[in-house]
Design a protein with these regions (language model features):
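Conserved beta-strand
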Residues: 4-7, 15-25, 56
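Short hydrophobic beta-strand immediately N-terminal to the Walker A/P-loop
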Residues: 30-33
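GG-anchored amphipathic helix commonly corresponding to the ABC/SMC/Rad50 NBD signature/C-loop
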Residues: 133-155
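Conserved catalytic loops of ABC-family nucleotide-binding domains
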Residues: 149-151, 160-195
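A short helix-turn-beta junction within AAA+ P-loop NTPase domains corresponding to the substrate/partner-engaging
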Residues: 196-219
Length: 223
C-alpha cells in the first residue's frame, strides 16, 4: 500500500506541493486532482521516489526509505521529466526503455519481439508525437510494467493528451484491477472524469484552511 501523510514539496517561495495526504492499495486506481501542472508533476515525482519531500511522509508497504519507493514505483509520461522525446520512433523508444530495466530482470528482452508479444507492432514505425492518446498510454504503461518489480504506477497528467477520459481511464482501471498482477495506480489529473465514483484526492487536502485561503488569490493571478 502507498500511504502519504502531510506530503509537501518545497518551492522557491511557496510550497510547490502543498500538504497532501492520500493512500492507494494494490488493486486500486486513485485519481488526484490539481489545477497546476507543476503541482501534478511534483506530486508524481514525490510519490514515485524521484523527488525528496520537503515534509511529511511517503511509505510503501510500511517502508519509508525512498529507495524502496523507487524500486516499486514507476513514473509514467511526466512532462519535462521522462515523457518520450518527440523525435524518437516507437521502436527506438522501446529499445531505450527496455535497456533501463535492471539486467537481472531484463533477460533477453529485445524491442522487436516485445512489440509483437505486447501487440504494438501496428505503431512500431510511428514517431512518439504521432501516437494516438490511447495507444500512448497503453504503450508507456506496458513499458513500465516490463520491470517485474513494478507494483506502483504513477502517471503525470494522462488527460493532457485528450479531453476524452476513454483514452486513458479504462487502461488504468484495467491495470489496477488485474487479478494476475494487482497494482496500485495513481494518476495526477486536472479534473475527475464525469461520473467518477472511485477513490479520489485533491492536492492540498492536508493544508491548514487558513493557508489555503491565503493562497487562492495568488493561484488565480497566475492563470
Amino acid at each position: 500500500m502507498l500511504s502519504v501523510q502531510q506530503l509537501r514539496v518545497n518551492g522557491r517561495r511557496d510550497d510547490l506541493l502543498p500538504p497532501t495526504s492520500l493512500q492507494a492499495s494494490r488493486g486500486e486506481l486513485l485519481l488526484v486532482t490539481a489545477d497546476r501542472q507543476d503541482q501534478r508533476t511534483a506530486l508524481a515525482l514525490a510519490l514515485s521516489g524521484r523527488m525528496k519531500p520537503g515534509g511529511g511522509t511517503v511509505s510503501w508497504d510500511g517502508q519509508t526509505k525512498i529507495r524502496q519507493l523507487r524500486v516499486a514505483g514507476a513514473l509514467v509520461d511526466s512532462p519535462g521529466v521522462n515523457e518520450p522525446e518527440q523525435h524518437l520512433s516507437v521502436r527506438d523508444l522501446v529499445t531505450e526503455d527496455l535497456s533501463l530495466i535492471p539486467r537481472r530482470y531484463r533477460g533477453a528482452l529485445l524491442s522487436k519481439p516485445w512489440l509483437k508479444v505486447n501487440r504494438f507492432e501496428d505503431i512500431a514505425g510511428m514517431w512518439a508525437e504521432q501516437l494516438p492518446p490511447r495507444r500512448r498510454t497503453e504503450l508507456l504503461t506496458a513499458l513500465a510494467l516490463a520491470n517485474p518489480r513494478t507494483d506502483l504506477l504513477v502517471l503525470d497528467s494522462p488527460d493532457r493528451h485528450s479531453g476524452d477520459p476513454a483514452d486513458w481511464l479504462p487502461r488504468l482501471r484495467d491495470l489496477a484491477y488485474d487479478g494476475g498482477r494487482p497494482l496500485a495506480v495513481v494518476a495526477a489529473v486536472t479534473a475527475l472524469p464525469p461520473g467518477w465514483t472511485g477513490p479520489a484526492a485533491v492536492v492540498g487536502n492536508a493544508a491548514p484552511k487558513a493557508a489555503i485561503t491565503e493562497e487562492q488569490p495568488e493561484i488565480e493571478d497566475a492563470k
